[in-house]
Amino acid sequence: MFTDIQGTWPTHERFILTSCDDKYFDQYFPRFYKTYKEHWHLPIHVHIIDPSDISMQRLDKLDVTYTHCTTDPAVLKWPYSYVTYCQAQRFMLLGHNLLEGQSVIVADVDSYALREPNEIQKQTLESDMAFTEYNGRLMATFCNFHHGQRVLAKEAAIKMQQLIEDTNTIGVDQLVLKQTFESFPYNNLTHNEWIRHLDVKTEEDVKQHNKCLIYHEKGTRGKNKPVETTWTDIGL
């Protein structure tokens, strides 16, 4: 699955990693890029799956590093294979490439930053593995991978690849994150402070979401808030 990854893994000690297919990149990345650049002031690395020529041209013009790949149909044996493959690939890429000294924030491309973290929050996020706990899960939406757990990160990457190839498991990324890291020390990114994992159904939900550092609407049930940031807004 990784023999055809093209591009170079960044050497920054701290950066933000996101991964998506071409459709999500086109729809959500301008907002992701604009808000994380404005509030977090960190390098961004994009891994794009099955990119179009237009997306590649855009990446070349942006202040990002990137890798990309074309999907091998041999790994898509099951009805949900492509969805789980896209969800898990950032953790698989990260697990095989995380360098000594790196602390990498992993964020969904349809998330966006609302405000800058304070120094205590930055320390909580970057000093160790860090996850938000919700409904007994370690959430994949926004988390931090620390070089102190490079061995476990690679083990998680291998497990995810095996599950995608051998089963019709949905939510491979969160399943393996819990199996791999739950019993080891990690920093807790407090729910409703960092991010909110409840559905957005009412104006009160929007209000509570807007209090967090990161805004994210769950799955296809949410995403009611229009994406107002366009490619023109980031200079393309």
Model-predicted segments: where are they?
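Short hydrophobic/aromatic-enriched beta-strand-loop microsegments
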Residues: 64-70, 105, 128-131, 188
